Amino acid sequence: MKIGFIKDVDGYRAPVHPESIDKYTADIHLEKGLFDYLNYSEPKNVKTISKLNELDIVACVENIQHKVVKNLKEGAVLIGIFDFDKINEIKNLRPDIKVFSFFKLPRISRAQNLDALSSQANLLGYASVLRAAKETSDVVPMMTTAAGNIQPSKVLILGVGVAGLQAIATAKRLGARVWAFDIRKEAKDQVESLGAKFVEASTEAQDSVYAQEVSDEENQKIQEALKKQVIESDIVLTFAQIPGKKAPVLIEKSTVENMKENSVIIDLAAGTGGNCEGTE
């Protein structure tokens, strides 16, 4: 059996760690330059992929190119962290291959060692705060100098799942003042346990594990509740998504136009439409 590991379109992540490759008993093939961005050396004595249509199993992380899918052999197995839209896109392109996505794994104890989605979401939350801190022209923590005090940045986080919680924790460790919002009932306790302040909206909190779609009227109330917070924030990070559906728009274009100069928005829901109006 031939197993191939290939790069994502952006090349930032690899579907396998170099140290794990020796554990496989199958015939392993790697795409050339798979670990270049990660600063790992290519493992020795491992074959380079020459033809995709010779591989029985192909693993990637998330962003796979159409030309790669088209070149897979008939009956091949494709493994990755694909959302519902991506799965349908791949199946429409190649109905003759099998697609397995970690995105669809149930959140149960027996499957915890396969929960790649949570690990990636944790990294996303962490990396997004560091990227925002790099992009803003302000310092994140409070600083006391002989010339006076520099106030800490205000960070607003929308969507408090795994990524959002990690973003809160990271921003707090950097010394920011943090506010957060989520429509789920359990989110308030989670936010406050990390030392952040919860933004209240005049909508009914959801009791579900995952956020569910709300009416246009309810969404309008959420936008109004968040408007003042967004305008006053130095950094806004959005993670709000609804499984299998378009991401809710939480920030209107008019709100963005009224934000402070040099403030930063990073929309992590851009792949499903975005939480910020105008996200591309």
Language-model-derived ranges and their functions:
Residues 83-110, 247-280:
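Rossmann-fold NAD(P)-binding glycine/threonine-rich loop
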Residues 2, 67-153:
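Glycine/serine-rich phosphate-binding loop and adjoining beta1-alpha1 elements at the start
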Residues 11-15, 66-71, 242-251, 276-277:
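Glycine/threonine-rich flexible loop motifs
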Residues 8-9, 32-35, 63, 83-84, ...:
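Short, ordered loop/turn segments at secondary-structure junctions
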Residues 25, 44-54, 64, 208-236, ...:
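A structured beta-alpha segment of the ubiquitous adenosine-cofactor-binding alpha/beta core
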Residues 8-30, 35, 141-229:
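Glycine-rich phosphate/diphosphate-binding loop of Rossmann-like nucleotide-binding domains
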Residues 1-96:
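An N-terminal-biased, well-structured beta-alpha scaffold segment characteristic
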